[in-house]
Amino acid sequence: MAPPLPRTPTPTHPHSHAPPLPRTPTPAHPHSHAPPLPRTPTPTHPHSHAPPRSIQHRQGKDTKVNLYFPIDSKNPLSFLLGPTLKTRWCVVPVSFTFPLPDTDWLV
């Protein structure tokens, strides 16, 4: 009789003796042993471990640039609005009066 073939783990047989395959991290399995892929920062994930992009100035200095939240010294809210939006203030009357709930049943 031939020896059994090595099998990869399955949900019904998770204790297979075959070596596990390396997997890349996923949201459901973030602790994979495969090396993580380098990612560039995004607005939803600004703390990426990818190296920051840099630009070359005329003086020859290498400066880090934040591509997603540019800073404009003229407008203190530019980091919230982005490079293309302007700050617009508008006053809207809002009423905060609410009818009180019926408390007769508490007595």
From Swiss-Prot:
Keyword match Oxidoreductase: no
Composition-biased stretches (Basic residues): 46-58
Keyword Acyltransferase: no
Coiled-coil intervals, chain numbering: none
Sequence repeats (start-end): 2-17, 18-33, 34-49
Pro residues bias spans: 1-44
Region of interest: Disordered: 1-63
The entry's keywords: Repeat
Superkingdom per UniProt: Viruses
Segments for region (3 X 17 AA tandem repeats): 2-49
Name listed for the protein in its UniProt record: Latency-related protein 2
